[in-house]
Regions:
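Active-site and channel-lining beta-strand-loop segments
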Residues: 30-51
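Conserved beta-strand and immediately adjacent loop positions that scaffold enzyme active sites
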Residues: 38-40, 111, 143, 193
């Protein structure tokens, strides 16, 4: 890896950071995170802080968890990757799907569909909902309702049902038939009701 000065000098020059305009990233360069342990992260200048968003996607068990590192390392030597697409699968996917299904057995889950993240999961759920109604002979059931301020990802469908304008308005028009309802938040009371139910 290049030295810290090179990293700082090239920060935001070639990488388009999510949720920001490239020119803004040049004026206010993103913090460069260089290491992490448990729930703490450290930047290129040595400042350490708690990662209160959990890496946003994938570190709910903390950074540098030894059991996870060992499992990943072992798997990289056996089979680093293979798709479960078009008639193939792999043993870790089968084992993981059984473990997830067993966790949700009392809810009636019978199958698991793995995705690479939350946005992919929302896209898949939207497509499955459409397919479900089409197969039941109700192809016109195409509307989606979600809560204002709710976050549902950044892909096309996810942004469409996203209740947070920041992730939606710059890309509209998006998927038609998406409606955003006020959250049932008694403190702010968007319904102007006195009944707490």
């Amino acid at each position: 890896m290049k030295d810290d000065n090179f990293i700082k000098e090239n920060n935001a020059k070639h990488l388009w950071h999510p949720m920001g305009h490239p020119a803004d990233s040049l004026i206010n360069p993103p913090k460069v995170i260089v290491s992490a342990q448990n729930s703490s992260i450290a930047d290129v200048d040595g400042h350490e802080t708690i990662d209160a968003v959990g890496g946003l996607w994938c570190v709910n068990l903390g950074y540098s968890n030894d059991a996870i590192k060992e499992t990943i390392s072992k798997q990289l030597y056996e089979l680093p990757y293979y798709s479960g697409f078009a008639g193939t699968t792999n043993a870790p996917a089968i084992e993981a799907s059984l473990a997830v299904r067993e966790m949700f057995e009392e809810d009636g889950m019978s199958r698991v569909f793995f995705t690479s993240g939350g946005s992919d999961a929302v896209e898949t759920a939207l497509r499955l909902a459409r397919q479900y109604h089409r197969l039941r002979g109700e192809p016109n059931r195409t509307k989606f309702m979600s809560l204002k301020k709710g976050y549902h990802g950044t892909h096309f469908g996810g942004a469409s049902v996203n209740g947070n304008n920041r992730f939606r308005i710059n890309y509209e028009p998006l998927l038609p038939g998406c409606f955003h309802l006020p959250s049932p938040y008694a403190y702010r009371n968007p319904f102007n009701e006195t009944d707490p139910a």
